[in-house]
């Protein structure tokens, strides 16, 4: 039998332990994170995102451009590249991004930095180490207060068609479901530094104007006057070509809701400035490029989206994935803008919760502008120049299937794309086919971070 003193001591210890537990405050319940990769620092949320690709690319001709397809230089079937198939396995298209969001009084701030690995790399990149260089895709910040937004940084151009509103976020921009890093012919797009101002007078209407980085693009297919310095324009390898002022882009969007579906309609314009100088006459020449765009994303059923977009321009070819020149230079160094039109139509259908099928048809049409520099023909589309395209067309079909998709684990996707591309020059040498064609197959297994 335990002694009375020992029993009293045991009871006192138990009471002391109960009192201590009663005085210890219970830990406050923490809200579950919106994503396993969300980190809260101060009053800002840092979300790490992106995906990892294991991609196979097969082309019926040797385009020679790596993961992105250079549509404007598809080789002819009477050349060696036109008779050689291309096979490539790569993970260059993998992406990493960081999204930061915060509240600042009555305003909200968010910023995004995104990189992939399609930057310029060494010539022997595929020999041993496959050390692909990272590059900045997007890097912007947005300040929103009330009915107004301000965006600054490198973002999708305002001229690119939106799916809803005028948001710079990639899911709100029509970029297609394609795996090709050059997306889809007929789409208008660029990622460039800008200062964008957007107003939302109502839930269904948005209007914006953007001041964006310019670049006077002529490409390699425009023949310049013999005495004209190539450094005054971008011939595909002159990033420092001068521009008199930024590109000015405006857009209005209308997003009505019809039952459970939403529609999107928009109209946009672009104004661009070009300038050249002639040392022979000590004169400066100027020209203005313009373009008008109309786009729609129609949802006839909740699981189906119909997409249509077009850009009609006189001096806006750079925005057509660089497939068309902005202008040509005359013998006296004056400027003649070149007309070009792009258009794309497509359908995206979620046939099952885990499976989407998609298809697009896109085209780019480019006008011919030719002059003479003494006895030499100059401009775009001169006789016997197979690099000056009259039209380029692309038909695409594909499927996107999710093996699983869960916020805690991310998603594992199988995506396949088949495309047929045809380019038709204004003129070809004797014995050369009238057009060049290639077939593209892209297949990737993609893990999307949670």
Feature map (PLM): residue ranges:
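Outer-membrane beta-barrel "beta-signal"
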Residues: 399, 435-450
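Detector for outer-membrane/organellar transmembrane beta-barrel domains
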Residues: 250, 258-397
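Outer-membrane beta-barrel translocator domains and adjoining extracellular loop/strand segments
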Residues: 61-66, 122-132, 163-170, 218-236, ...
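Outer-membrane beta-barrel proteins
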Residues: 38, 84-88, 129, 140, ...
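Transmembrane beta-barrel outer-membrane domains
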Residues: 41-43, 87-93, 129-136, 186-190, ...
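Cleavable N-terminal export/targeting peptides
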Residues: 1-30
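Transmembrane beta-strand segments that form the barrel wall of outer-membrane beta-barrel proteins
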Residues: 110-119, 213, 266-273, 363-364, ...
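Outer membrane beta-barrel
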Residues: 32-68, 78-225, 244-257, 297-312, ...
